[in-house]
């Protein structure tokens, strides 16, 4: 049943070759999100391992992590914490820079979004290099969070981001894998 559910989810993801540049296959989850059954299955699958447990906050990475993370937080009766690109949050923040293929970027979180000891799940749509997710885990830990898991709809295992998080001691849950970049 679980394998069939994840196969149907995988079929709901649109693959766009040579976007944003030649040689890349973009995995577009907007088709999954727009299909009520697929969206529900994805959220239910992300929630299932943590239902009935104590999760204080769900942190979502901008932008699709907001959609998924908000739905997960709602089902877990947890709070939701946005992790945004620098300059997008109105209150006092802490931030961290991380490497991109060409240059760096920076994400931030409100300083009062997490209380020390909060049990937090990190949610995003896809893990590739793990750069943004690693930076998010570091921010959450800096504020005293216990990062229970990092959850993604899609993993691109050849790129190694999920393993990078595991090397930091983070449990990683994904719903499907795609080969390539």
From Swiss-Prot:
Coiled coil: none annotated. This is Adenine phosphoribosyltransferase. Homodimer. Belongs to the purine/pyrimidine phosphoribosyltransferase family. Catalyzes a salvage reaction resulting in the formation of AMP, that is energically less costly than de novo synthesis. The keyword Ribosomal protein does not apply. GO terms for cellular component: cytoplasm. Pathway: Purine metabolism; AMP biosynthesis via salvage pathway; AMP from adenine: step 1/1. It is found in: Cytoplasm. The gene is apt. GO terms for molecular function: adenine binding; adenine phosphoribosyltransferase activity; AMP binding. It comes from Methylorubrum extorquens (strain PA1) (Methylobacterium extorquens). The keyword Ribonucleoprotein does not apply. It catalyses: AMP + diphosphate = 5-phospho-alpha-D-ribose 1-diphosphate + adenine. GO terms for biological process: adenine salvage; AMP salvage; purine ribonucleoside salvage. Its EC number is 2.4.2.7. Keywords: Cytoplasm, Glycosyltransferase, Purine salvage, Transferase. The lineage of its organism: Bacteria, Pseudomonadati, Pseudomonadota, Alphaproteobacteria, Hyphomicrobiales.
């Amino acid at each position: 049943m679980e394998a069939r559910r994840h196969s149907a989810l995988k079929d709901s993801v649109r693959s766009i070759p040579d976007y944003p540049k030649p040689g890349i296959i973009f995995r577009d989850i907007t088709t999954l999100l727009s299909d009520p059954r697929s969206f529900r299955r994805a959220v239910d699958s992300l929630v299932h391992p943590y239902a009935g447990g104590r999760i204080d906050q769900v942190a979502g990475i901008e932008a699709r992590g907001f959609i998924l993370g908000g739905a997960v937080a709602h089902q877990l009766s947890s709070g939701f914490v946005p992790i945004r690109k620098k300059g997008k949050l109105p209150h006092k923040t802490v931030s961290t820079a991380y490497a991109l293929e060409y240059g760096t970027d920076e994400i931030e979180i409100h300083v009062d979004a997490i209380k020390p000891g909060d049990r937090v799940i990190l949610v995003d749509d896809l893990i590739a290099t793990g750069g943004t997710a690693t930076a998010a885990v570091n921010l959450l830990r800096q504020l005293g969070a216990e990062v229970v898991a990092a959850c993604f709809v899609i993993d691109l295992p050849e790129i190694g981001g999920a393993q990078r998080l595991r090397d930091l001691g983070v449990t990683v849950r994904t719903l499907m894998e795609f080969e390539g970049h």
